[in-house]
From Swiss-Prot:
Keywords: Cell membrane, Glycoprotein, Membrane, Sialic acid, Signal, Transmembrane, Transmembrane helix. Residues 1-19 form the signal peptide. InterPro entries: Glycophorin, Glycophorin_CS, GYPA_B. Gene3D superfamilies: 1.20.5.70. One of its GO terms (cellular component) is ankyrin-1 complex. It is a single-pass type I membrane protein. Disulfide bonds: none annotated. Belongs to the glycophorin-A family. Pfam families: Glycophorin_A (PF01102). It is found in: Cell membrane. Its main location: membrane. This is Glycophorin-B. Component of the ankyrin-1 complex in the erythrocyte, composed of ANK1, RHCE, RHAG, SLC4A1, EPB42, GYPA, GYPB and AQP1. Interacts (via the N-terminal) with RHAG; this interaction bridges the (RHAG)2(RHCE) heterotrimer with the SLC4A1 Band 3 I dimer complexed with GYPA.
Length: 123
């Protein structure tokens, strides 16, 4: 009885997901042709350009976010420089603790699943 209910719920969810994804694709293809892009500005900042493309919006049209290209820092001679910030290199103790926590999480999950299987087998 419960198996049939769960099957029907899963099937209805799959149908609703596939229906929503096809309508989003159809809506995107139908309205993307009506979205117009106009070139607004080309700003020069540290010898690099940042272009902005706004979208004009009407009813049921796809909105677009302005895009700005960010380039890595350079020295005067044109070589790339590693940005310096307080978290450039974590201490070895932090790396070891992160690895141990991930291992404990994986081992704990495996033990929890095996404990649950043992309880189901006994019942």
């Amino acid at each position: 009885m419960y198996g049939k209910i769960i099957f029907v719920l899963l099937l209805s969810e799959i149908v609703s997901i596939s229906a929503s994804s096809t309508t989003e694709v159809a809506m995107h293809t139908s309205t993307s042709s009506s979205v117009t892009k106009s070139y607004i500005s080309s700003q020069t900042n540290d010898k690099h350009k940042g272009d902005t493309y706004p979208a004009t919006l009407g009813a049921h049209e796809v909105s677009e976010i302005s895009v700005t290209t960010v380039y890595p820092p350079e020295e005067d001679n044109g070589e790339w420089v590693q940005p310096v910030h307080p978290f450039s290199r974590p201490a070895p103790v932090v790396i070891i603790l992160i690895i141990l926590c991930v291992m404990a999480g994986v081992i704990g999950t495996i033990l929890l699943i095996s404990y649950g299987i043992r309880l189901l087998i006994k019942a």
